[in-house]
Swiss-Prot record:
SUPFAM superfamilies: Ribosomal protein S6 (SSF54995). Residues 103-124 have a biased composition (Basic and acidic residues). Residues 96-140 are annotated as: Disordered. Belongs to the bacterial ribosomal protein bS6 family. InterPro entries: Ribosomal_bS6, Ribosomal_bS6_CS, Ribosomal_bS6_sf, Ribosomal_S6_plastid/chlpt, Transl_elong_EF1B/ribsomal_bS6. It comes from Pseudomonas fluorescens (strain SBW25). GO terms for cellular component: cytosolic small ribosomal subunit. This is Small ribosomal subunit protein bS6. One of its GO terms (biological process) is translation. PANTHER family: MITOCHONDRIAL 28S RIBOSOMAL PROTEIN S6, SMALL RIBOSOMAL SUBUNIT PROTEIN BS6M. Binds together with bS18 to 16S ribosomal RNA. Pfam families: Ribosomal_S6. Keywords: Ribonucleoprotein, Ribosomal protein, RNA-binding, rRNA-binding. Residues 125-140 have a biased composition (Acidic residues).
Length: 140
């Protein structure tokens, strides 16, 4: 069996069906003896260019190990499912199980947002507690 990285884009009006689609595709791979190494739902994102007058899509990435038969069936499912507006299958030399760069960047962004928002609230609290500590020391 070979390793593949699969990314497919779902029409934004069909975003609520993504869970069912992923379940169906993973079941197809696993029933044929394949294995899902990584599954990431990147959510709805802006497209670089419009596809069929659609400017956003729901992105899903899978790293799988499967047979050629299962891959062909999966590609047929993509082709005949109107909700899938684009797909990309890349053959990999080995299984990729780590977090993708896309998710790492998203986590970094959210961490920076948290840090940016946190000092305003914590800074005021720590300043108050420092003042009270200093006043206690002054009495001694």
């Amino acid at each position: 069996m070979r390793h593949y990285e699969i990314i497919f884009l779902v029409h934004p009006d069909q975003s609520e069906q993504v869970g069912g689609m992923v379940e169906r595709y993973t079941k197809l791979i696993e029933e044929d003896g394949g294995k899902i190494h990584r599954l990431e739902d990147w959510g709805r994102r802006q497209l670089a260019y419009a596809i069929n007058n659609v400017h956003k899509a729901h992105y899903v990435m899978l790293n799988v190990e499967c047979t050629g038969k299962a891959l062909a069936e999966l590609e047929d499912n993509f082709r005949y499912n109107d909700a899938v507006i684009r797909n990309l299958v890349i053959r990999r030399e080995e299984a990729v199980t780590g977090q993708s760069e896309m998710l790492k960047a998203e986590e970094n962004r959210s961490e920076r947002r948290e840090r940016r928002d946190r000092p305003e609230h914590e800074g005021a609290d720590s300043a108050d507690s420092d003042d009270s500590d200093n006043s206690d020391n002054a009495d001694e």
